């Protein structure tokens, strides 16, 4: 594994001699704009190994993406190599249908400490408009505006909660809007976490379980999403979506199209720079 090869993969050629916030922000943004959040392996007959060398080979050498445990694991390795004070944390994602956080940890995120201040860095929550674009200062109750919207942490009795203020979608004629629950109000809860450091091996069982559990969104939907300079692309099953943030003062532009199987393959190559070794079986089960 080679840090320069990783820099090339994310198209980063800036200075990295200082493990500071400016460099962290640059690496993070290059990472999320080059490495898709995707679960395509489980929909084309591949096994996902939570092993650093396997993750490196998949994402850096084969130019694939990965789900949270892969893309954040790679980012953890890179930042560690660069000299950052960093640790892995475990998160419990919010399930809107159940109006509750999951009982078990099902997400990986990273905590970076710079000059005594802690920042949360998460490159693996990219299946929609909830991917942060900047490292988030670990402070409770403070709005942290970013291009995708306003994020904030709320801390309660040692548990931290990440939420985002929703923005309106401007949907041109002929497009189909993303589904959401209007009764949930203006705030979208994302996940909870504690500051207890984790080891990557703590997620081996989860990594294996998510590949076979029948009722998870990862089984029900083939997902590939990538942040762009002004929004994101998302391919869910046969539905391709493109969002541009702040298209209007109070709304983001959302355009969606339905693709054929052949167009799915072409879109993966053209929009996400992904060429799969095995045949993808697109999936998009509602609910």
Curated annotation (Swiss-Prot):
The active site is at 68 (acyl-thioester intermediate), 107, 122. It comes from the Eukaryota. Pfam families: Acetyltransf_2. It is an enzyme of class 2 (transferase). Signal peptide: none annotated. Disulfide bonds: none annotated. Its EC number is 2.3.1.5. GO terms for molecular function: arylamine N-acetyltransferase activity. Gene3D superfamilies: 3.30.2140.20. Keywords: Acyltransferase, Transferase. It catalyses: an arylamine + acetyl-CoA = an N-acetylarylamine + CoA. Belongs to the arylamine N-acetyltransferase family. This is Arylamine N-acetyltransferase, liver isozyme. It comes from Gallus gallus (Chicken).
């Amino acid at each position: 594994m080679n840090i320069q090869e990783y820099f090339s993969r994310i198209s980063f050629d800036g200075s990295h001699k200082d493990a500071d916030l400016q460099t962290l922000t640059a690496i993070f943004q290059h990472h999320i704009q080059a490495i898709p959040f995707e679960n395509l392996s489980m929909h084309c007959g591949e096994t996902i190994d939570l092993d650093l060398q396997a993750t490196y080979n998949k994402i850096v050498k084969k130019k694939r993406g990965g789900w949270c445990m892969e893309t954040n694991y790679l980012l953890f390795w890179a930042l560690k190599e660069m000299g950052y004070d960093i640790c892995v944390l475990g998160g419990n994602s919010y399930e809107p249908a159940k109006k509750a956080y999951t009982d078990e940890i099902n997400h990986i995120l990273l905590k970076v400490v710079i000059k005594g201040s802690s920042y949360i860095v998460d490159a693996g929550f990219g299946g929609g408009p909830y991917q942060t674009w900047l490292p988030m200062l670990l402070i409770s109750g403070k709005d942290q505006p970013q291009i995708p919207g306003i994020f904030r942490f709320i801390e309660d009795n040692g548990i931290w909660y990440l939420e985002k203020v929703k923005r309106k979608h401007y949907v041109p004629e002929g497009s189909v809007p993303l589904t959401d629950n209007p009764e949930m109000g203006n705030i979208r809860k994302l996940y909870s976490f504690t500051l207890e450091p984790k080891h990557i091996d703590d997620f081996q069982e989860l990594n294996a379980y998510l590949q076979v559990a029948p009722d998870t969104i990862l089984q029900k939907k083939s997902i590939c999403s990538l942040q762009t300079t002004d929004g994101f692309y998302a391919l869910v099953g046969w539905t391709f979506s493109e969002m541009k943030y702040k298209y209007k003062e109070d709304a983001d532009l959302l355009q969606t199209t339905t693709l054929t199987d052949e167009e799915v393959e072409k879109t993966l190559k053209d929009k996400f720079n992904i060429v799969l070794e095995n045949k993808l079986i697109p999936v998009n089960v509602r609910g």
